[in-house]
């Protein structure tokens, strides 16, 4: 599978023993849609099965779909609707429910679904059948859809919008998404990333089976288990999903097993899109001032430091690594939720959620990895973030990672210091208020403006001296200005970067503000791409 061809869309288990006669009574706690044989299930056995599976050669279960499904358009795929009369927990009459996605287009891997009675640890498979779906608006002749094709994924609903608006979606490979209070999907998470930026082709593991614990009528949390499989790894996952009024919180227990040596293992990966923003205008020749699902990578390092790294749409792939030990959290953030910043009434970038990872086990040494790919539009995800352990992963290794995911407008935690409000860049070398027109600077320079607010900046005594501390990996910085910004109750720091060589290597910039010995802000980190020497000139 190729990353750019992966569609972005809105195991046979070992025998666990026979079922006693008394177990038949437990069937009433299993979903009515489940029609398979009763079998035993618990998470410990799933973990053992995944580890055993890693000791065997990988066998792909990708199927050849009939042309009527393989050649569907996205409109046809979206028009095939799951029938809410056959929802997984319709007979529970509770707060939660599950619908399934039909296979089709690029979603060729059959995903098997099971209903679980958590009291008796018994499961039954939900088999694919025509009457689970409505085909009328799709133009698909269901008589040409034959066999037990499995499902492509599932979506979760919570009262009061059961069967109306889903709040969580698992669809394709190990991708999944959730909404926040704005009810708008945005960036995605994945179960595992393998070799996203390595010498060999990236590998996309699949969730091949899911088990859903049947909830009590008054339950408000989903409990879902998953088996992950790929040529290089297997995994057993437990998802505790709490769909709150303003956010979705997932607690994940991931047990990962390596089939082969893995050059680059990505834990808790997330995927997003950044085309253009306040600091990056190369691809913004549209009516929209900004186009992105996320605008920054935010990190709360193990040593307590907060870092803001604005995202880029580079001309060529760029990989950045931020070393850390036991990180407190990191995530991709959509910090600006003002409609005026996007002017978008179709996909509503102003309503996109942020995604924050909070480790709840010791992750040890490693790095937060950031991959930024070039994109010419808004339909391809070009941002990938994940945790990479420092210790090389060898065949036979087993690892356990526990973490929470917060899908919310902004992360659930923030620095008590001032935060980066916005980053801007443009022509430098002139005094503000004398923008070039009939006159141009003699020396080429690039100007950066970084706005800070919060953290008590608006309460600093008048006349407080504020000092920006800036470092760059090459070139030099000059012409600093610090401006009060009453509209955001903060300050703007501007400076010019001037080259000192012909190098076009990325410039790594780092800045924070302080007064005396007191640090006032989080750390701003930025990667700037200087133009070629022959382009460093004005008319």
Curated annotation (Swiss-Prot):
Q: Keywords in UniProt for this one?
A: Periplasm, Signal
Recount the PTM note. Predicted to be exported by the Tat system. The position of the signal peptide cleavage has not been experimentally proven.
**Signal keyword on record:** yes
Signal peptide start-end: 1-29
Chief localisation class: periplasm
- Lineage top rank: taxon: Bacteria
User: Which BP terms does GO give this entry?
Assistant: beta-glucan biosynthetic process
An example of a GO molecular function for this protein is: carbohydrate binding
InterPro entries according to UniProt: Gal_mutarotase_sf_dom (IPR011013), GH-type_carb-bd (IPR014718), Glucan_biosyn_MdoD (IPR023724), Glucan_biosyn_MdoG/MdoD (IPR014438), Glucan_biosyn_MdoG_C (IPR007444), Ig-like_fold (IPR013783), Ig_E-set (IPR014756), TAT_signal (IPR006311)
Location comes to:
Periplasm
Any Pfam family from its record, for instance, is MdoG
Pathway involvement of the protein, from the record: Glycan metabolism; osmoregulated periplasmic glucan (OPG) biosynthesis
Function field: Probably involved in the control of the structural glucose backbone of osmoregulated periplasmic glucans (OPGs).
* Protein name, entry field: Glucans biosynthesis protein D
Q: What organism does the UniProt record list as the source?
A: Pseudomonas savastanoi pv. phaseolicola (strain 1448A / Race 6)
Upper lineage ranks?
Bacteria, Pseudomonadati, Pseudomonadota, Gammaproteobacteria, Pseudomonadales
């Amino acid at each position: 599978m190729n990353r750019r061809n992966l569609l972005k869309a809105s195991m046979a288990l070992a025998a666990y023993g026979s079922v006693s006669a008394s177990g038949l009574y437990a069937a009433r706690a299993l979903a009515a849609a489940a029609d398979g044989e009763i079998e035993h299930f618990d998470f410990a056995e799933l973990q053992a099965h995944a580890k055993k599976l890693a000791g065997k050669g990988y066998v792909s279960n990708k199927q050849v779909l009939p042309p009527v499904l393989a050649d569907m358009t996205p409109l046809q795929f979206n028009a095939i609707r799951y029938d809410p009369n056959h929802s997984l927990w319709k007979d529970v009459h509770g707060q939660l429910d599950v619908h399934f996605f039909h296979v089709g287009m690029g979603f060729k891997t059959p995903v098997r679904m099971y209903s679980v009675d958590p009291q008796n640890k018994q499961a039954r498979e939900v088999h694919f059948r025509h009457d689970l779906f409505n085909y009328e608006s799709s133009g698909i002749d269901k008589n040409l859809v034959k066999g037990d094709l499995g499902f492509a994924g599932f979506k979760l609903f919570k009262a009061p919008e059961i069967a109306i608006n889903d709040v969580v979606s698992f669809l394709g490979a190990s991708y999944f998404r959730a909404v926040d209070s704005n009810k708008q999907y945005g960036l995605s998470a994945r179960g595992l990333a393998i070799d996203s930026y390595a010498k060999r082709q990236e590998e996309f593991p699949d969730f091949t089976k899911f088990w859903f614990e049947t909830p009590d009528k008054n339950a408000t949390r989903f409990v879902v288990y998953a088996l992950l499989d790929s040529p290089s790894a297997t995994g057993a996952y437990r998802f505790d999903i709490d769909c709150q009024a303003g956010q979705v919180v997932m607690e994940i227990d991931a047990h990962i097993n390596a089939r082969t040596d893995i050059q680059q293992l990505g834990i808790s990966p997330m995927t997003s899109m950044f085309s253009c923003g306040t600091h990056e205008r190369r691809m913004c020749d549209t009516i929209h001032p900004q186009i992105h699902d996320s605008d920054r990578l935010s990190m709360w390092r193990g040593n307590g430091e907060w870092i803001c790294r604005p995202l880029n749409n580079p001309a060529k792939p760029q990989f950045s690594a931020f070393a850390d030990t036991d990180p407190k959290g990191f995530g991709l953030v959509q910090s600006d939720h003002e409609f005026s910043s996007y002017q978008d009434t179709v996909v509503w970038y102003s309503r996109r959620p942020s995604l924050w990872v909070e480790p709840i086990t010791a992750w040890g040494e490693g790095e937060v990895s950031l991959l930024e790919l070039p994109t010419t539009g808004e339909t391809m995800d070009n941002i990938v973030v994940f945790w990479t352990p420092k210790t090389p992963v060898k065949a036979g290794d087993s690892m356990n990672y526990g973490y929470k995911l917060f899908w919310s407008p902004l992360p659930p935690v923030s620095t008590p210091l001032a935060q980066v409000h916005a980053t801007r860049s443009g022509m430098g070398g002139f005094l503000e208020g004398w923008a070039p027109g009939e006159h141009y600077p003699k020396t080429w320079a690039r100007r950066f403006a970084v706005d800070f607010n919060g953290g008590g900046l608006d309460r600093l005594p008048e006349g407080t001296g504020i000092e920006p501390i800036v470092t760059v990996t090459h070139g030099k910085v000059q012409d600093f200005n610090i401006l009060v910004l009453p509209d955001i109750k903060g300050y703007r720091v501007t400076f010019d970067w001037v080259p000192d060589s012909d190098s076009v290597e990325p410039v790594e910039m780092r800045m924070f503000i302080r007064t005396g010995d007191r640090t006032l802000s989080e750390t701003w980190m930025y990667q700037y791409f200087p133009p070629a020497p022959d382009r460093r000139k004005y008319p």
